[in-house]
Regions:
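Conserved alpha-helix/loop element of class I SAM-dependent methyltransferases that forms part
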Residues: 1-18
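Conserved class I S-adenosyl-L-methionine
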Residues: 20-26
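Class I SAM-dependent methyltransferase SAM/SAH-binding core
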Residues: 29-74
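Short conserved loop adjoining the S-adenosyl-L-methionine
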Residues: 77-81
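A conserved beta-strand element that flanks and buttresses the S-adenosyl-L-methionine
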Residues: 87
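A short, conserved alpha-helix within the catalytic core of class I
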Residues: 95-106
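Conserved beta-strand signature within the Rossmann-like core of class I S-adenosyl-L-methionine
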Residues: 112-120
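Short alpha-helix
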Residues: 143-160
Length: 181
């Protein structure tokens, strides 16, 4: 599922990213980062986890190292600079709608092209799992994903956020959305 979603998100960007500045917001282990750099982008790969940044750096082929700047820190920081494009795969899944809109707004203020991002869809199954998780909280669990109705995000932005596709494969289900300036 994640491979298909990555391909879906990449399809929103030009095939030739030669010289384009791209933020991989919440880059994780760097799979998207490597694909962006291989397509010619100048990538800023940001993640809050220094451990994941270390893994991403190690996995990146040597021939692509000069095209990537790794940053352990806030993916929304203005200090990261301006970008032509932003991708945020599974980076906003723990945010409520207000926080998603604020995050996308902050990114949009310094992005010239599209912002492709994912949210967990508001399906009956995910909503039930979310409710159960809230009823039985435990401190040793990851934060709960917050299912989103992509139509609410579209309405809240007067159509600047559009639904691209839903990817559902195995245990992975997510909606790809796109913000256009």
């Amino acid at each position: 599922g994640r491979d298909r979603m990555r391909a879906t998100m990449l399809s929103r960007l030009p095939e030739d990213l030669g010289g384009a500045r791209v933020l991989d917001a919440g880059c994780g282990t760097g799979a998207m980062t490597a694909e962006l750099a291989a397509r010619g982008a100048i990538v800023t790969a940001a993640d809050i986890s220094p451990a994941l940044i270390g893994i991403a750096r190690e996995r990146l082929p040597g021939s692509l190292q000069s095209a990537v700047r790794f940053v352990a820190g806030d993916m929304l920081s203005d200090d990261l600079g301006r970008f032509d494009f932003v991708v945020a795969m599974d980076s906003l899944i723990y945010y409520g709608i207000t926080d998603i809109l604020a995050a996308v707004g902050r990114l949009a203020a310094r992005t010239d092209g599209c912002i492709a991002f994912t949210v967990p869809p508001k399906t009956a199954l995910l909503s039930a799992m979310w409710t159960m998780g809230r009823l039985f909280p435990r401190s040793d669990r990851s934060p709960l994903m917050v299912p989103q109705d992509h139509r609410a995000l579209t309405r809240a932005t007067a159509g600047r956020i559009a639904h691209v596709a839903r990817v559902s494969r195995g245990f992975y289900i997510s909606d790809c959305l796109e913000h256009r300036a």
